[in-house]
């Protein structure tokens, strides 16, 4: 049974080719935003960074959570998130910085996965069906 999300629209068949590393000025944290390759952001997901390792230069964050309204009033089911993540793994795999829509040198997706069960990373609870990603960022300025 599909859960209702107040005033939100379901995203289906998302084709995601970029993941951006961006700053959110209000709280000075980095977030991930997903968008279409054609340069038009068809939806944004301000996922939280759940782990950062300065030694390996790896940043792990939530790309999209199931049944959670995003910043544009949209949501995705677990099944649609899985489809989008698999499409990204096969066709996307690009990282940019600050919505530039230009592939970022020195940033590589090293891991992308769907949570198979609820679990914890530090103090963060990750819900089953959440799309997570680890990006290696070689640029110390980022």
Task: Annotate each predicted stretch with a short phrase.
Residues 1-142:
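Signature of dsDNA virion morphogenesis modules
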């Amino acid at each position: 049974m599909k859960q209702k999300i107040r005033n939100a629209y379901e995203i289906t068949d998302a084709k995601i080719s970029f993941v951006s590393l961006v700053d959110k000025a209000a709280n000075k944290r980095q977030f991930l935003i997903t968008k279409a390759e054609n340069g038009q952001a068809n939806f944004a997901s301000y996922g939280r960074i759940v782990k950062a390792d300065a030694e390996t230069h790896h940043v792990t964050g939530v790309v999209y959570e199931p049944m959670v309204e995003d910043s544009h009033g949209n949501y995705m089911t677990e099944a649609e998130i899985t489809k989008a993540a698999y499409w990204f793994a096969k066709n996307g795999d690009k990282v940019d910085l600050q919505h530039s829509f230009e592939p970022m040198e020195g940033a590589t997706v090293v891991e992308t996965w769907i949570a198979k069960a609820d679990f914890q990373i530090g103090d963060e609870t990750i819900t089953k069906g959440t799309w997570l990603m680890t990006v290696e960022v070689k640029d110390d300025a980022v």
